[in-house]
């Protein structure tokens, strides 16, 4: 039945539409953030994307590796760090982590708006509506009712289409820095560049005109040394270490950078070749599997398209590489934990800033290199040789710091061995740093109970106007 509009009802409808447009609640012309809107047109891709929900196990990495608590002392990751899960959990996990705190207002909390930047297609929507200044200004809480749809279709595809796109301006600027603008890239390169909007190293700028903006530190290249030099020239630090007072760098997840340096990247094997292969449905029709995960789960469609070796051979080879990387990673962690506490002992013994500067530089560089290698998820497959090389330099620099500390402590009259606190478990390490985990967890529980439902209600109301 056709609805007959009176002049009065028509005028009212027009007024409501104008009001919605003025208030900025209309969906963006470029981005449809609601993943379910793609379900009918791209059903096979949508259903496989939805299957990333199967990656639901929560693995507490601080329980697995308690030394991480010490390495990140004074930084949010010492509170809480879980292994990454499937794309379906991106928004859920950033809401639940202790790192984002328990803010109660838009001006409250430890984290900036930029912490949403890789979690949702709502991010490009808000940037398109408000501009980057509008999006990046303020605290993380501000985006709570806006950033609600998890990583999905609109992050990598043009609105309502399968055509790939880079949806984040800061990523496009980074590609231009490497002289590879997305518009001029090959189809194969684009298949990796859409992933590189998020699976990269980044930091939050502190310049006057781009305060809080996300930036990839690629101005001098993507190697660990190039980015280290870039940060050093800026005198940039993510935080000051609570124990050693070192101006620290926190690597995020430079998967794209390490992939480029490895055998797959050097041979132009894209991210999607291994993690989102072409597969056949029950009718024999090919489509791109959007269940991003372990290539060995789809061996014939991934590794098997290039490698003649058996799945068993390739799995065992990767396991061997993981063991080698893990061994060197653990050695670096042991050296760094001791270096941090020995640096504290030197400060306590009266060391000056001038005496400590070269030591803290060694610690900074060592931990940055350790983090660059270990935060690059999948590095044992992507670039095992580069991982071992970088971790080797991390161990060397930590050892350099400890040799200098031993000499300085002797000069300061410290003749007894340094007493290291018990950091053998997550709880003991956090207690040694004076962290009130009981309060943090209680505050987070209150936040989840009282704030998250408000965000969901506001988002539902807004999306009903699209």
Swiss-Prot record:
Q: How is the cofactor bound?
A: Binds 1 Ca(2+) ion per monomer.
Keyword Isomerase found: no
Catalyzed chemical reaction(s): 6 Fe(III)-[cytochrome c] + NH4(+) + 2 H2O = 6 Fe(II)-[cytochrome c] + nitrite + 8 H(+)
Q: Where does it sit, as one GO cellular component term?
A: outer membrane-bounded periplasmic space
Query: Can you say where in the cell this protein is located?
Result: Periplasm
The molecular function terms in GO held by this entry are: calcium ion binding; heme binding; iron ion binding; nitrite reductase (cytochrome, ammonia-forming) activity
Q: For Ca(2+), which residues are the binding ones?
A: 201-202, 250, 252
Q: What's a Pfam family in this record?
A: Cytochrom_C552
What residues bind substrate, as annotated? 202, 253
- Residues engaged in binding heme c 2: 153, 156-157, 290
Q: Which superkingdom does the taxonomy of this entry point to?
A: Bacteria
Q: Which InterPro entries match?
A: Cyt_c552 (IPR003321), Cyt_c_NO2Rdtase_formate-dep (IPR017570), Multihaem_cyt_sf (IPR036280)
Q: In which residues is heme c 5 bound? A: 264, 303, 306-307
**Where does it primarily localize?**
periplasm
What does the UniProt keyword field contain?
Answer: Calcium, Electron transport, Heme, Iron, Metal-binding, Oxidoreductase, Periplasm, Signal, Transport
**Positions annotated to bind heme c 4:** 271, 274-275, 382
Q: What EC number(s) are associated with this protein in UniProt?
A: 1.7.2.2
UniProt enzyme class? oxidoreductase
The protein's role, per its UniProt record: Catalyzes the reduction of nitrite to ammonia, consuming six electrons in the process.
Family statement drawn from the similarity comment of this UniProt entry: Belongs to the cytochrome c-552 family.
Identify this protein by name: Cytochrome c-552
Q: What species is given as this protein's source?
A: Shewanella sediminis (strain HAW-EB3)
